[in-house]
Amino acid sequence: MTNPTSDGQPRGRLRVLVLGSTGSIGTQALQVIAANPDRFEVVGLAAGGANLDTLLRQRAETGVTNVAVADEHAARRAGDIPFCGPEAATRLVEETEADVVLNALVGALGLRPTLAALESGARLALANKESLIAGGPLVLAAAAPGQIVPVDSEHSALAQCLRGGTGDEVAKLVLTASGGPFRGWTAEELEHVTPEQAGAHPTWSMGPMNTLNSASLVNKGLELIETHLLFGIPYDRIEVVVHPQSIVHSMVTFVDGSTLAQASPPDMRLPISLALGWPHRVPGAAACCDFSTASSWEFEPLDNEVFPAVELARHAGQAGGCMTAIYNAANEEAAAAFLAGRVSFGAIVETIADVLHAADQWAPKFSETPANVDDVLDAQRWARQRAQRAVAQARPATASAKTPGVV
């Protein structure tokens, strides 16, 4: 690892390995790195292969030779790809010397690369929340204190605010949620949502899966679980509040009644830069709030009846074991079915609820702490199969969308 100088600044450039380089987080991370050549250098890239032209352009721009592509056909088309196949990203991590591994892969397939990064001793800049949620106890056991630095804006905000007090001074953590594009809609109106509508987030620019998860509030459920795992605060002391402007990213309330909040315009380059350079800040990483003009910041309670995903996540987290992996796997199956037009938007969370209920009733072993990665994968396979059955029985998607208030 790079050693700090006497003034607390990093000595030399940090070597960064970017997993998921062609996605939203990965491309923005490369922008941050390119803008700060005195601080960072890219030593490897990994991607699925769906955006092969983007990956090849990134390889040319960074000059790296260590590249991993999961899709073997895409790797053959690209030529000269040293790591290919389902385990390509994991092998890349194992065979590349890096100070920081940014895991921006999508889905629970990021678990093995996450564990490999922790095993290597590199700092893990974690955007792939699913690997922490699925791996839970395994990931925490593999991590040294402070080795995982979150990339999500909410958890980056919490990490910054928690500097303002000791652990025993924390009363509660407050996650903010924009409410997504369907804030204020009824459950009946949500039945008519189309994938196009669900893909239009009001404040953030994200990848398609994160955008859909934000619309269903599943993303906030995943972030609730991630908050507990990262900071060790019990679930009953983690709140979620709707903040439509997405300026305040999270808050920490302390035992004396004071609350610290982190505020900045919605721009992922800020938490990305902080995760890459932690604990040092990168000057000019993103724009700051402009207090010279009038503005309003609103906060309101989350409607858990219309959007039950957060409370389902709380239940899964409190149950422990592999239940959070089951929550995530069920969502991935149901979300894919919605995007394919096979089920309604509301069926996503209904499927998660069905799978969690079945796990509670028929598979109590899933609440036990997993002994290894295979235990997690077994739980995920069971959850996917159960979710597929639920999807097959769910209400089909409606043909057209409705806007609230329009008959």
UniProtKB/Swiss-Prot annotation:
Signal peptide: none
InterPro entries with a match to the protein in the record: DXP_reductoisomerase, DXP_reductoisomerase_C, DXP_reductoisomerase_N, DXPR_C, DXPR_C_sf, NAD(P)-bd_dom_sf
GO biological process: one example: isopentenyl diphosphate biosynthetic process, methylerythritol 4-phosphate pathway involved in terpenoid biosynthetic process
Binding site for NADPH: T22, G23, S24, I25, G48, N51, N128, E130, G207
Known cofactor(s): Mg(2+); Mn(2+)
Enzyme class: oxidoreductase
Keywords from the UniProt entry: Isoprene biosynthesis, Manganese, Metal-binding, NADP, Oxidoreductase
Catalytic activity: 2-C-methyl-D-erythritol 4-phosphate + NADP(+) = 1-deoxy-D-xylulose 5-phosphate + NADPH + H(+)
Residues given in the record as Mn(2+) binding sites: D152, E154, E223
UniProt binding sites for 1-deoxy-D-xylulose 5-phosphate: K129, S153, E154, S178, H201, S214, N219, K220, E223
Domain of life: Bacteria
Pathway assignment: Isoprenoid biosynthesis; isopentenyl diphosphate biosynthesis via DXP pathway; isopentenyl diphosphate from 1-deoxy-D-xylulose 5-phosphate: step 1/6
GO MF annotations in UniProt: 1-deoxy-D-xylulose-5-phosphate reductoisomerase activity; manganese ion binding; NADPH binding
EC number: 1.1.1.267
A Pfam family the protein falls into: DXP_reductoisom
Protein family according to the UniProt entry: Belongs to the DXR family.
Function summary: Catalyzes the NADPH-dependent rearrangement and reduction of 1-deoxy-D-xylulose-5-phosphate (DXP) to 2-C-methyl-D-erythritol 4-phosphate (MEP).
Protein name: 1-deoxy-D-xylulose 5-phosphate reductoisomerase
Encoding gene, per UniProt annotation: dxr
